[in-house]
Amino acid sequence: MEDERIYTIPLRDVTNNSPSTKRAPRAMRKIRDFLKRHTKSDNIKIDNSINEKVWERSLNKIPARIRVKVVKEDDMVIATLIK
């Protein structure tokens, strides 16, 4: 069974509650945790486009929110960036 959804993941709290040198890694962790919580799956594949978007403006200037398309196939969840 294939299920497709679109999520807007807020990253503002990562910006406000993290030192500038740890924002991008914590944002990637927050994205993974958000998807685990909302898809109820531990097997998550995050597309490289999401990683590039978070790291686009360096380590400390992450986006405030990010929109992703999530496709759930059997036991695998694949997340890609919406432009």
From Swiss-Prot:
Query: Family assignment?
Result: Belongs to the eukaryotic ribosomal protein eL31 family.
> Record's CDD domains?
Ribosomal_L31e
Name of the gene: rpl31e
Q: Which InterPro entries match?
A: Ribosomal_eL31, Ribosomal_eL31_CS, Ribosomal_eL31_dom_sf
Q: Which SUPFAM superfamilies does the UniProt record give?
A: Ribosomal protein L31e
Which GO BP terms, alphabetically?
A: cytoplasmic translation
Provide a Gene Ontology MF annotation, just one.
structural constituent of ribosome
Gene3D superfamilies, A to Z: 3.10.440.10
Task: State the UniProt keywords alphabetically.
Answer: Ribonucleoprotein, Ribosomal protein
**Gene Ontology terms: cellular component:** cytosolic large ribosomal subunit
Pfam families reported in the protein's UniProt record: Ribosomal_L31e
User: What is this protein identified as?
Assistant: Large ribosomal subunit protein eL31
- Note the NCBIfam families from the entry: PRK01192.1-1
